[in-house]
Amino acid sequence: MLHEIILLLAGNTSGLFIEKNGQILLHPSVQPLHPGERELINDIVSLASKRKRIERYIEIFDEDLIQQNQFLLKALRLLLSKKLFLYDESLANLERMIISSDPYFVGSGKFVSLAQLEAHLADWKETLSSLLVLQGNISQCLSVASTFQKLHNMYMGSTHLNFKKLVLECECAFQKTWLDELVQYLVNDSGDDSFKCSFLCGDTKDFVSCSNNVPFLTQDIVNCLVSIRTCMLNAKKCFTDAFCEILRCFYRLVYEMPLPLTKSSVTKLADEMFTLVSEKIIFQLASFHQIFDLVKMLEMVMLLENVEFLPTLSEMFRDVRGEYCSSNDVQGVVIDDILPVVLRKTISLLDLATEYGECVSFLKLVSIFDEEDEMIRSENRKIDVEGLNMQLLLCLKWPFNLFMDKNALNVYSDLWILLGSLHLSITKIKSLFYERKEYTAKGISQPWTQLWVTLWFLSSLQYYAYECVIKPSYCKLRESLTELYRTQKLRMQDCSQLHALTLTYAKKMLFFYDDDLHISLNSIYHELSLFRSQEVSKVDCQLAAHVSHSIECIRQKENDPSYDREIINALIVQLNL
């Protein structure tokens, strides 16, 4: 009987047993020797039912599964196969001990009882039951994120130590498989977005901004991995030697990863990978000096610290438009044609190519009404140059686009509008005062008090923007980048992070998020657009009220801990004069 039971437990068939409703039971014709023995035998051979269910799942596993966590389900099949192999080995050892009357198992008696057999198989009974629970739960998951989350929930929700160990073993096996797949993801273009979003984040196509991440991933890690992949796919085409060297390093790093994975360990892995990519690929194409030039251009052109840029741009637009209007009748065609010419001539006249190198090729001048350009932002923020609402954009090419994301590009375009509107309004008031002298000389005298107040306010705001915020923060950024370069610890992720911190600080201190203040400033700009030097006295002027409201908006920042108190207080003191 014992031999028949062991054969049955190992997956063989036996005439002494029947299968009923998925359960294997002792045949009714077989009469047990003692009362209760049938129930005990049926309890022992229940392992055969469990083994059969697991084996069936392994055998019918669909290699063509379209589930996004397919590679994890394959890992589950391997884990189940491994456990069944160990189970079969233990049965073979058990039968050997019975046949040889091994005293370790048989003891002092001559025969092995069913109770001894049951006790010996108790651990496997628990293990096979746990494997079925594991298989049932995981096979229902459709994504990588949900699979790892399910494992986490099962681990945290169980009070049984052995089950926790099994779940942890499964999790480590899955994570090892995930790491292997990660390397393949980083170096191969599968062209399957659904795989990428599930692989990194969950059940959404917008995988870069997904909040349902794999438990050991953060959004920063996801962004870093996507950047690494972009670099590797580009290197695959033009840097074969570097690509192969980095790939070998990737496999070494993955092999050395401690399990189970944590956010900290995966962050370190992504950082080391990006460091390799930076050294071997990125800075071979985008040198430190070019990044340094880009930073200078961001400050001087995009943030308009170069006071000659906007006036020159306006002058060029006026001249080029005059040339084109003589040969073109359609205004839309004229604008499309002349803006690239205007920018090119402005760059040439100011010799910006000498100053910033090839970085000037990243600049693009567009009309605010260009609906095809996805980077156009809010219509509430406009800069009027010679009657046309223009916007200067940054169109960075790889690998320069690793220095800042699309959101940062949009911020620079908005800051160009914000600072440009400020600059043009100050120029407008100054021109009014300049022309006023001629009218005053002819005996025409008009009240200009509100314009003086407005000029004082806008000039104070401009001085604060450049002397207190932009110049110091970008000077510090360049010094930090230079220090990294000198210590030979330059990595693109560090450059990008330093720039992001600088831009975040500048945005905050330039009141980028204060819509109330911007509405008030836009009201000032709108009123100024109504003025003509000879008509100032006829305008129903509300400038003083708008200036007063703007100052009040700034005063409210005095005790706000999120602002740099020293410089914000200096501005408030100046505005209180």
Swiss-Prot record:
InterPro entries for the chain: GCP_C, GCP_C_sf
GO molecular function: gamma-tubulin binding
UniProt record, GO biological process: astral microtubule organization; cytoplasmic microtubule organization; meiotic cell cycle; microtubule nucleation; microtubule nucleation by interphase microtubule organizing center; mitotic cell cycle; spindle assembly
Location(s) in or outside the cell: Cytoplasm, Cytoskeleton, Microtubule organizing center, Spindle pole body
Keywords tagged on the record: Cell cycle, Cytoplasm, Cytoskeleton, Microtubule
Keyword Cytoplasm (UniProt): yes
Known function: Required for proper anchoring of astral microtubules at the spindle pole bodies (SPBs), during anaphase, ensuring correct cell polarity.
Record-stated family: Belongs to the TUBGCP family.
Protein's recorded name: Gamma-tubulin complex component gfh1
Organism this protein belongs to: Schizosaccharomyces pombe (strain 972 / ATCC 24843) (Fission yeast)
